[in-house]
Amino acid sequence: MERRSFLKATGSAAAAAALAGCSSDSDSDGTEDEAGTGDGMDSTDSSGGDVGTDLKEDGDLWRVNTGTMTTMDPIEATDTQSGIVIQQMFDPLMNYPNSQPAVEGLMAADYEVSDDFTTYTFQLKDATFHNGDTVTASDFVYAFERLTASDNSSRAYFVLDSLGVTHETTTETVDGEEQEVYEPGTLGVTAVDETTLEIQLDAPFASTLEMLAYSSFSPVPEGMVGDIEGYDGEVSQGEFSSSNPIGNGPFEFDTWDSGTEARVSAYDDYYGESPNVDGVHFAVIENDSANYNYAMNRNADIFELPTAQYDPGKVSVEEEDDQGRQIGTYGELRNGATANYSGVSNIGVFYLGFNMASVPKPVRQAVAYAMNQHTVVEQVFKQRGEPAYNFTPKSIFPGGAQNYNDRAENEYPYGYDDSQLGQARSVMEEAGYGENERVAIELTIYESGVWSETASILRDQLQSVYIDLEVNQAPFNTLLERGRNGELEMYSLGWVADWPAPDNFLQLLNPPQTDTSLDFPISYVNWQPENGDAAQQAEEAYQSIADNPAPTEDAQATRNEAYIEMENANWEDVAMLPVYHELTELFWYDHVDFTPPAGMGPSRQKMNTVSLGERE
């Protein structure tokens, strides 16, 4: 079976949820991989005073998570906020150092790749888990099997589809239909000896090493959780995921009070660079005002600024480094301090998605004509990003950022830096709509002030083109659940890179993986052949990507052509309307010695190298 065709053949796709791959929209954080976040449910009042401070210690690094964490189990997490904490406790084979998009070995001391790019052999570093057990290759085998076979895994497709690890299938009846599903215990991941791990792929995959930097692939002590065949488990998965996660990272679990705070403490026997802080404390604050007040009261060392309280005129950029990070200062703040500042273009995209089973094509196109991405970024997001006209971010776009810009300016069919309401009205009238034949559409947004303002602008514009847009907000997790159940018509979400390649983004536009009748659709747009030729074009292009996975120039050229085909198909049918590419901005006080994250975002950064001076 061809790699990446497995999901189609089995009729199942894994739940993919921005974070990783995960990210934030400047108001707060909540990419699920389908990403989104907002200023949602309060964990405090707007004072931002004492929320999440019970566990704080003076020697801790104080952070804010702007969304609710859902799990501490690496195979289960799909949201950015959980990923930020998991990143501190679990070390996979590879790593994005300070979120730079070029990977380095982490648990891997060395590795070899076969001439046909299908066998990867890793030598492991000498490390221990937080319970004192030595990390062995068998622990990785067990962790990969959990990721693939556990009912608690949200990322089985990472192994079977994205990487394409060799495996066998068996026939099972699912909902009255026979399907080929993974046969437990057949995965091509082998412990050659205690410190040598071998991974066998069905076919080459150009982003294998980048994929293995994802925390889902982190080792877990063999037999710790009994949620796969052959293991009874020392703890239940519920306990492991909430109160007893055992990892191998620079910090170990201390405690977690869902919706309020979490803390990890420095692990004394860490094999790498020992943490410079006693621990990291995360206050969970989803409300923008509370988040801002918390930081202004100096309860956070490193923080974000909600867009409502952000003034672009207070940014002073002093340098731009080789990772594209703009470094400088911001201030002064409300509390009189001048903060350190960093801004970097995130490898991600925020967009409006359409359930094509319920929103007709003329309506989708009319929304695209009405949307002026430049206006949204400048007036609503206060220039904290770049207008998005392609789904793939600029830094990884085929042909580079210049090709991205050229396509946007010269080929985007719905108006570059222009709201074309006349065209929107025409396409609706041609489809039979008018003042006496209006259409009502529900737009569900995650709880975010900036998305609420964007939706209001769009709603007012669409009134004149016979579309009555009803805007409703939902907590992030509720929005995702409704999406997976096919209950959304139009929605706001985002996606940030699991690995820095276009196929990681364009998989959301692979029609078979958008079917919400599946258990875990990767996106919620229901792009089916009955929608027209563009769906077939997108599906064939994605299959071309899957058929040419090798890290060679010829295969890359073929993939690049297919990437553009998928972008064009999305332009035609408007399955997803790109809105903006986020600028990740962080702020920190002078007592913090901190290298800010690069393009892979905060959820990929470990905090063991951060140092603290004396707080004011």
Which sequence ranges carry the predicted segments?
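Append "and occasionally in soluble cytosolic enzymes with long acidic Gly/Pro-rich linkers
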Residues: 359-460, 465, 565, 614-616
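N-terminal lobe/hinge region of extracytoplasmic solute-binding protein
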Residues: 64-113, 246
